[in-house]
Amino acid sequence: MAKEKATLPPTGAGLMRFFDEDTRAVKVSPKGVIALTLLLIAFEFILHMFGSSIFG
């Protein structure tokens, strides 16, 4: 007697869509994000060191 095939439940493939290529957002590379973060850290450090003398 042959074994019966086990049937798997439906996975729902195709029910959800991810729109990766259809975006209107500003695209920033990972290097750009790191550079902007480092610039922000440097700016805050400079403000911490010299801000009281500059802004009174």
From Swiss-Prot:
Organism, as annotated: Thermococcus kodakarensis (strain ATCC BAA-918 / JCM 12380 / KOD1)
Originating gene: secG
NCBIfam families: PRK01253.1
Pfam families reported in the protein's UniProt record: Sec61_beta
Topological domains, Cytoplasmic: 1-29
Subcellular location: Cell membrane
Name this protein carries in UniProt: Preprotein translocase subunit SecG
Keywords: Cell membrane, Membrane, Protein transport, Translocation, Transmembrane, Transmembrane helix, Transport
Subunit structure: Component of the protein translocase complex. Heterotrimer consisting of alpha (SecY), beta (SecG) and gamma (SecE) subunits. Can form oligomers of the heterotrimer.
Lineage of origin: Archaea, Methanobacteriati, Methanobacteriota, Thermococci, Thermococcales
Residue spans, topological domain Extracellular: 50-56
Superkingdom in the source lineage: Archaea
